């Protein structure tokens, strides 16, 4: 078994990081329940990746397998993520699910300690 080499990714790698995370979450049960339509998922997940990756790249804490077969985005303790930037993606959520998604985010905030590292996304290309 080969042990993968993990490297820090730079902002120049943004598209590669977003691509592997998009593939890795393409069959994620929760995200696909939120965005069951493929085109909506791709459009909205791209917005989510753009926003969630900003904090990680600004703090130089994006890690990837050297060939970008997998990547992770980290947020350091004390960093605030502005959930309102995800607002435009809510129009793509089926109407009967919006309230549940909002409740999910509200509940998540209750149990997200401020002094902890946060791993918003980590995934591997399913073909690997």
Predicted regions and their residues:
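A short beta-loop-alpha structural element at the N-terminal edge
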Residues: 5-19, 23, 27
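A structural preference for long, well-packed, hydrophobic secondary-structure segments
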Residues: 16, 126-128
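Helix-loop element at the rim of GNAT/NAT acetyltransferase active sites that forms part
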Residues: 19-39, 52, 96
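Active-site rim helix/loop that mediates acceptor-substrate recognition in acyltransferases
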Residues: 38-61, 109
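Conserved beta-hairpin
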Residues: 54-73, 123-126
């Amino acid at each position: 078994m080969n042990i993968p080499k993990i490297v820090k990714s730079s902002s120049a790698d943004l598209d590669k990081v977003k691509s592997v995370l998009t593939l890795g979450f393409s069959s994620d049960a929760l995200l696909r329940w939120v965005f069951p339509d493929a085109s909506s998922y791709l459009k909205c997940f791209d917005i989510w990746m753009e926003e969630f990756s900003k904090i990680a790249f600004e703090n130089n804490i994006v890690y990837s397998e050297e060939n970008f077969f997998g990547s992770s985005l980290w947020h350091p303790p004390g960093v605030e993520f502005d959930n309102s930037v995800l607002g435009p993606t809510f129009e793509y959520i089926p109407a009967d699910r919006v309230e549940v998604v909002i409740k999910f985010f509200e509940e998540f905030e209750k149990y997200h300690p401020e002094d902890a590292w946060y791993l918003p996304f980590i995934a591997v290309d399913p073909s690997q």
